[in-house]
Design a protein with these regions (language model features):
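Conserved class I S-adenosyl-L-methionine
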Residues: 1-66
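Class I SAM-dependent methyltransferase SAM/SAH-binding core
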Residues: 63, 70-116
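A short acidic, Gly/Pro-enriched loop at the edge of an enzyme's catalytic core
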Residues: 118-125
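Residues lining the SAM
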Residues: 129-131
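A short glycine-rich, Lys/Arg-flanked "PGG" loop and its adjoining helix->strand segment in the class I
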Residues: 143-155
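SAM-dependent methyltransferase
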Residues: 160-234
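C-terminal lobe and adjacent flexible extensions of AdoMet/dcAdoMet transferase-like proteins
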Residues: 224-275
Length: 275
């Protein structure tokens, strides 16, 4: 069954303790320190050259790759960035679009598979967090996605992504069952870790309240994610034509250790920049 279909309707309920604001703050700090994208209003408008203005607008674009329901995308927009959100689930994007309508933000949303990313211009920054990259189950899928990211990055542009480690799947969540009850819905999340393939299977069973009634609808979804090592990820980045700027433990913001569960990689486009 395709992931993030029925689950999209209750996704934000079960993710309500996710520190999106902390992520947005940290990503903004990284963009300011290492990137080239500027916030709307921070860009000097003294140039009268149309070409310069077009290039400047491309440089300042920020893409949220695997944006889901757009919570992080909205927060980055509120910080002043010109945002694009890409996700392969139309159901998730429908919720993101409803948030855009409520907030009045100018975010562009595109329904695309990140493995077939297609944009209308180059962009200054790509961010992909909340383990979106782990949904790529084969090495060649990661490499191709990273090559596409690099292809659309403005010279010197920044790619910031996170990923769940093999350690997290093997030692923390693999073969565990999690259950939660909420007023509107309940869920059972069963994990099955396949050691040889390093793939974690999520079987989700969700009971969601139907409208204003006391009736609940049951639906299920199965998700698959693959664990990667830091060495593998750095290899994918380099083969895609980018250089690694920084790697950090996503929880401590310090150098990763063997027990790191989620890792940030900050990479930069270098070939177009050098050329």
């Amino acid at each position: 069954m395709e992931a993030y279909t029925d689950f999209a309707s209750v996704y934000d309920i079960f993710m309500d303790d996710t520190p999106y604001q902390e992520w947005a703050d940290f990503l903004s700090e990284l963009i300011e320190e290492y990137g080239i994208s500027k916030r709307i209003g921070d860009t000097c408008n003294s140039s009268t050259d149309d070409i310069d203005e077009v290039l400047k607008s491309e440089r300042d674009l920020v893409l949220d790759l695997g944006c889901g329901t757009g919570t992080l995308t909205e927060l980055l927009y509120q910080k002043g960035y010109d945002m694009i959100g890409v996700d392969n689930s139309q159901e998730m994007l429908n919720i993101a679009i409803s948030k855009r309508e409520s907030s009045g933000s100018g975010i562009l949303y595109l329904c695309q598979d990140m493995r077939e990313l297609e944009l209308y211009s180059t962009i200054g920054t790509v961010v992909s967090v909340c383990d979106s990259v782990n949904y790529l189950l084969e090495d060649h899928e990661v490499e191709e996605t990273f090559r596409l990211v690099n292809n659309y990055l403005y010279p010197g542009g920044l790619f910031i992504f996170d990923f769940n480690t093999v350690y997290k799947y093997q030692q923390v969540i693999g073969d565990t069952t999690i259950a939660e009850n909420r007023e509107e819905c309940s869920f059972i999340w069963e994990n099955y870790y396949h050691h040889k393939e390093r793939i974690n299977e999520y079987d989700l069973t969700i009971f969601a309240k139907e409208g204003g009634s006391d009736l609940f609808r049951r639906f299920t979804e199965t998700h698959f994610q693959r664990g990667y090592t830091l060495k593998e990820m750095l290899g994918f980045v380099k083969r895609a034509g980018m250089e690694v700027v920084l790697v950090l433990d996503a929880d401590t913001h310090k150098a990763p250790v063997d027990e790191s569960e989620r890792i940030y990689v900050i990479a930069q486009e270098c070939r177009k920049k050098q050329g």
